[in-house]
């Protein structure tokens, strides 16, 4: 029988079969292949879900989409975070903590590479500085992104609009700690009981409150929301430079005048002339990413830097290779 993987914990899988949860383990014949939240699996054995019972996962169905990352930008080994997602909700606070635009760009690259629809979810609008919201929306306007803006307290009207966007979809929440992901999940799934964190007054960063990836069913008309641990980094070392450029959809078409095999990092690159000034920050972000996956930084020699995405060694590591 088919079931949906809603959680993974030390070799045990919480699967949803109809209206019941069934704990399962992976059959030996599946080998070392990993099972992640969002996977559709086939179960055999005791699938009653009764306490103390354990079913077996004997097959993992082909994945429609795969959201992945690497440990850092110099590590080519990919880690699968979630399977079969339809949407990626990029949750970003407009203040407390300050928005990290280059982290948003990394999430966007991962979404486009996985063929997952990205959605900007901008929180704490009540704390936003003047023009803070408008500047972010203007930067990403060329991408035609869907977006939702949330203040505190959360508006019922905005939540209703977000519920319509999530209905019938498998949606993943990503963002750094402290941006309001857990608050949002608790509002959308009343019995979720996700722990709400705070922002450290010393570092200005959020404290981790969710330690694992978990899928939660949305109330009717249904759908799934997948919460992930707060991320301070998001490695893209498994991606080629060509694919990263292609994921910057607002800039990719402007590379037509670049010379063959252009790295987009040197003086011969045509992007310096074709990219409008309004997109200068996006071009800077692209080039920082390209330098990072090469192990270099603007103005440095190869190997002279730690990858930007590995800036926090204590970062939680959702997903598996």
Residue ranges with predicted function:
Residues 11-15:
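Short aromatic-glycine-enriched beta-strand elements
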Residues 21-35:
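Beta-strand/loop nucleic-acid-binding surfaces
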Residues 1-9:
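Structural detector for short beta-strands of small beta-barrel domains
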Residues 181-194:
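A conserved segment at the C-terminal end of the G1
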Residues 16-18, 219:
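Short strand-coil-strand connectors
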Residues 80-84, 91-145:
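Phosphate-binding glycine-rich loops and their immediate beta-loop-alpha structural context
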Residues 127-179:
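Canonical P-loop GTPase G-domain recognition
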Residues 33-54, 59-81, 85-87, 110, ...:
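Helix-rich effector regions associated with P-loop NTPase G domains
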């Amino acid at each position: 029988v088919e079931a949906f993987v809603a959680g993974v914990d030390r070799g045990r899988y919480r699967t949803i079969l109809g209206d019941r949860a069934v704990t399962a383990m992976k059959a030996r014949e599946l080998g070392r292949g990993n099972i992640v939240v969002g996977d559709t699996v086939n179960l055999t054995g005791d699938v009653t879900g009764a306490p103390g019972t354990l079913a077996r996962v004997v097959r993992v169905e082909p994945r429609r989409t795969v959201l992945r990352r690497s440990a850092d930008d110099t590590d080519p080994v990919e880690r699968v975070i979630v399977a079969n997602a339809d949407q990626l909700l990029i949750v970003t606070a407009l203040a407390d903590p300050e928005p990290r635009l280059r982290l948003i760009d990394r999430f966007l690259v991962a979404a486009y590479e996985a063929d997952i629809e990205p959605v900007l979810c901008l929180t704490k609008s009540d704390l936003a500085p003047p023009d803070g919201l408008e500047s972010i929306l203007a930067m990403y306007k060329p991408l035609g992104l869907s977006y939702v803006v949330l203040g505190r307290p959360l508006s019922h009207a905005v939540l209703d609009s977000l519920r319509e966007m999530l209905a019938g979809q498998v949606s993943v929440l990503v963002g750094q700690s402290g941006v309001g992901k857990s608050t949002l999940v608790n509002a959308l799934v009343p019995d979720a009981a996700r722990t709400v964190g705070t922002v450290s007054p010393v570092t200005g960063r959020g404290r981790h409150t969710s330690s694992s990836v978990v899928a939660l069913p949305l109330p009717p008309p249904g759908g799934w929301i997948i919460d992930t641990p707060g991320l301070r980094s998001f490695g893209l070392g498994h991606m080629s430079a060509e694919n990263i450029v292609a994921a910057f959809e607002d800039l990719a078409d402007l590379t037509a005048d670049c010379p063959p095999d252009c790295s987009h990092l040197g003086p011969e690159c045509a992007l310096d002339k074709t990219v409008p000034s309004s997109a200068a920050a996006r071009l800077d972000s692209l080039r920082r990413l390209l330098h990072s996956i090469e192990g270099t930084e603007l103005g440095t020699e190869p190997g002279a830097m730690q990858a930007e995405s590995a800036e926090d060694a204590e970062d939680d590591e959702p997903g598996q290779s």
